[in-house]
Amino acid sequence: LIPRPDTEVLATKLIDAARSAGPCRILDLCAGSGCIGLAAAANLPNARVLLGEYDEEALKICRQNIRRNRLTSRVASLGLDAREKPSRSLGEFNFLVSNPPYIPSGDIASLDVSVREHEPRLALDGGEDGLDFYRAICEKWRDALAPEGMLFFEVGIGQADQVLRIMRTNGFGDIQIVKDLNNIPRVVYGTLCE
């Protein structure tokens, strides 16, 4: 998926939160090209970052981008499915960030041709209501977060309140909604409480 300007808000919020944490581990899940995790690594010299991506072609791009940005000493990539419970061998992360597929399946045919024809469906399709990945990540990946770890999501138009509820139901608190440059609620983040 080609990074969009909206994603800058997500990366900035993550970097701001992690900057005060000192040495930390960050997981960029549904990493796509890896732009969010790589931006974090470039701005946070004490961070170790894992780019987790399901699609093999996107994973190749992640690896190329790690090398191009000369971040091989602090950034790794791994094939991970956000819909499946992670292996305990991954360890714990202080921050989990994700810009998952969030377009409702029925809306994909009506997307602008520049998106519909040039982006992999796998990177767009969030299930019937567009929220499948948010549910899966909150339910299955919360154990990959350290105590008081933080979860950051980019969300689609009109999804922020629903994602907030999903997070709250799964033990996250101090949940914030942040608007993008067009004044649209675009980022939802919170802290693991239990």
For each of these PLM feature ranges, what is it?
Residues Y102, T191-E194:
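C-terminal beta-strand of the catalytic ATP-binding
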Residues E128-T191:
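Conserved Class I SAM-dependent methyltransferase catalytic core
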Residues D6-S110:
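Conserved SAM/SAH cofactor-binding pocket of Class I
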Residues E53, R70, E119, G149, ...:
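Conserved functional loop/turn residues at catalytic and ligand-binding sites
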